[in-house]
Swiss-Prot record:
The lineage of its organism: Bacteria, Bacillati, Bacillota, Clostridia, Thermoanaerobacterales. The keyword ATP-binding applies. GO terms for biological process: 'de novo' CTP biosynthetic process; UDP biosynthetic process. ATP binds at residues 12-15, 56, 60, 169, 172. It comes from Carboxydothermus hydrogenoformans (strain ATCC BAA-161 / DSM 6008 / Z-2901). Keywords: Allosteric enzyme, ATP-binding, Cytoplasm, Kinase, Nucleotide-binding, Pyrimidine biosynthesis, Transferase. GO terms for molecular function: ATP binding; UMP kinase activity. This is Uridylate kinase.
Length: 242
């Protein structure tokens, strides 16, 4: 049996990933499919998986701010949206027999644990999935930054950035059929070229803490397992090129 390349990972899911074709709300079939891919790598390889979910399928803080809403208030609403998504994913995982804990950066003890770093690591060591909800708990910080921050805190080996495209391109492949895909990038290139893989805060945090990032297409079944096994799919973003 092939051996996995990574033991502890942070999986970053956009809120839109849970919405499926509709683009808004939560599609239970899509959530179940994602949960199935996560369960597969845990049952087969014992991978320690932490998840960060966005909230854009329910609410976008930047959109609310652009329409005149107070930015901090709009961002807090977005954080609550991530909690809704996290509970949906927790439910799907537990139906597959995977013990799952949701930890929120804003306390809401009736439905989830507060974020405690040492407890999160202990859960992972016991084979539980930990879903980090409510962003960093602070407005003005994206869920991409949450993924970078939590990856650094729990000493994850890699961030798996699940997208609707199969990697990083020099322009939007959904709009430009001639867009060129990168197999490998340095973080400084991402920043200098404004490639939009993550926002600049998240990118800088990954760069400063030497956390590699793999951008891959979530919509291809089995891709999470392929990434874990080190197959050459997607785009890897890291320090200096080999």
């Amino acid at each position: 049996m092939p051996s996995p390349k990574y033991k502890r990972v942070v999986l970053k899911l956009s809120g839109e990933a849970l919405a499926g074709e509709k683009g808004y709300g939560i599609d239970p079939e899509v959530v179940n499919s994602i949960a199935g891919q996560i369960a597969e790598i845990i049952k087969e390889f014992g991978i320690q998986v932490a998840v960060v979910v966005g909230g854009g399928n329910i609410w976008r803080g930047l959109s609310g701010s652009a329409k005149g809403m107070d930015r901090a208030t709009a961002d807090y609403m977005g954080m609550l949206a991530t909690v809704i998504n996290s509970l949906a994913l927790q439910d799907a995982l537990e139906k597959l027999g995977i013990d799952t804990r949701v930890q929120t950066a804003i306390e809401m003890r009736q439905i989830a644990e507060p974020y405690i770093r040492r407890r999160a690591i202990r859960h992972l060591e016991k084979g539980r999935v930990v879903i980090f909800a409510a962003g960093t708990g602070n407005p003005y910080f994206s869920t991409d930054t949450t993924a970078a921050l939590r990856a650094a805190e729990i000493e994850a080996e890699v961030i798996l950035m699940a997208k609707r495209v199969d990697g990083v391109y020099d322009s939007d492949p959904l709009k430009n059929p001639n867009a060129q895909k990168f197999d490998e990038l340095e973080y400084i290139e991402v920043l200098n070229r404004g490639l939009g893989v993550m926002d600049s805060t998240a990118t800088s945090l990954c760069m400063d803490n030497n956390i590699p990032l793999i951008v891959f297409n979530l919509e291809v079944p089995g891709n999470i397992k392929r990434v874990i096994l080190g197959e050459n799919i997607g785009t890897i973003v890291g320090g200096e090129r080999k």
